[in-house]
Amino acid sequence: MATRNVQRKSKRRYEFSHQCGKPSRRENVRLPGKARRMKRELHVMKAEAVGAWMIPMSAVWRSIGTLILLPLCVVTAMAFFACFGASMEASFWRSSTFWFFMLGMIMWLIVFFALERPVYLYVWGHEATHALFTYCCLGKVHEFRVTREGGHIVTDKNNLLIALSPYFVPLYALVLAFVFWLVGEYVDLTVRHPAPWSIFPHLSWQMLGYWALGAAWGFHFTFTVWMIVKDQPDLKANGTIFSLNVIVLANLLLLSLLLIQAAPTISWHDFGDQWMGAARRILHTATTALITLRKMLG
């Protein structure tokens, strides 16, 4: 994903282009003098910090942001796994919610690794998420294009939220959750109906909803990891390590929200207690390490 500033008629535009395949050989062709000058100007404009949400693109600010976010990621991960373990001890793993969600995710993993990947569907969702958050930030989308090889949108606003939102917002999972919630307001989705499979003799639409959410979350997770390892340029634009910390923290918070909503024995209060306990342990460990280091140096 690359971010490029394009100046037209004294109005600044931002292009988010998404590459799924190998770079085109045209990129290696030597450009004319005027084109080279324009390319240099674009690189200069790209280095400017723009937008109210945009993190200043200096090494100092990126380092400070990373130092703040890294322990937050560790603490949130510890709290999530502690709550997940507590829910498993409370027999959450026996519930239909857990099994159908995991079944959907496992079936998606089989599709992702064994069959042809629906790249076009992912790219469309990726660019649509950029567009959605552009509108949320009171911006405008001037161009939207999607192909199997990649896609791009051109907007008049750019910030950290717009640039990284596709990596931590599972668009299709959110759409499915909203649809099932809306239908559930008028129809009882918990009613079980006879099914032709012996392993699941009776199914409800709620169970199928959990299955679909599991597949949609697996879709988001696998494609997010698949694209990140391809070294996306917009991660570099915001600082790769800093961007990865933002993505990891946001996804952990979404997983924690999902666990709290699905597991009846876990509440926000429980998650908060686990989070504060993990933070105290991390702080105590860091303080002890600093005291030990000071004694060794002194």
Language-model segments: residues:
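N-terminal targeting leaders characterized by basic, low-complexity, disordered sequences
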Residues: 1-26
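Metalloprotease/metallohydrolase-associated module, dominated by Zn2+-dependent proteases
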Residues: 21, 28-94, 98, 146-293, ...
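Canonical hydrophobic alpha-helical transmembrane segment
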Residues: 97-108
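Short pre-active-site segment immediately N-terminal to the catalytic Zn-binding motif
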Residues: 108-125, 152, 156-160
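Active-site recognition of the HExxH zinc-binding catalytic motif
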Residues: 122-135
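M16/MPP (pitrilysin/insulinase) zinc-metallopeptidase core fold and M16-derived inactive scaffolds
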Residues: 140-145
